[in-house]
Amino acid sequence: ITWSLVGSEMCIRDSPKVLSYVDVLRGNAQVGEKVAVIGAGGIGFDVSEFLAEHPREGEQPLPEWMKEWGVDMAGDTPGGLVKAAPEKPARQITLLQRKPTPLGKDLGKTSGWVHRATLKSRNVEMLKNCSYEKIDDAGLHIKIGEESRVLDVDNVILCAGQESLRELYKEDGKNFHLIGGADLAAELDAKRA
């Protein structure tokens, strides 16, 4: 695998620690207990949430969801809320972005808060203004401003730097309309997808 992070000085070549989010979501990659997710757009948030959850068969049972979000099923408390009791996260996750803006700032107006709250409840560390130095046996070497840091991680999952590939579109010669991520892969969200 060779990935180049668009706009970054780092190029990752054949590191066994580096995984594609596509392989992770398809179940084609073994993911360790400590993970760095590069890219805090919609895909990065979704992948982080996916990795923080414990595998289960089917949907989360409603009583479990109510407990996680602090909803009083009996209705005995004012406002129907009790202290939330989220489950322990399945992994230790650090979500990183190069931008200096708050993580998740550009997520959907009606759902972004849920994604941020979910990752917060799963103890996901969210780091902004990062530059990526290198990956080695010690982990992912980053800088936050002038501070150097090494994240001790088993895997680095890339959710950044996607570029639209239009070769098949051009080769086919048929009249298609390019939309969503096929047209412009950057900052993809459900509305534009």
Regions found by a protein language model. Name each.
Residues 1, 115, 165-168:
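Residues within well-ordered alpha-helices
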Residues 4-5, 126, 150-152:
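Short aromatic/basic micro-patch
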Residues 1-7, 12:
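Single conserved hydrophobic/aromatic residue that forms the stacking wall/gate
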Residues 104-130:
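N-terminal Rossmann-like dinucleotide/flavin-binding domain of flavoprotein oxidoreductases
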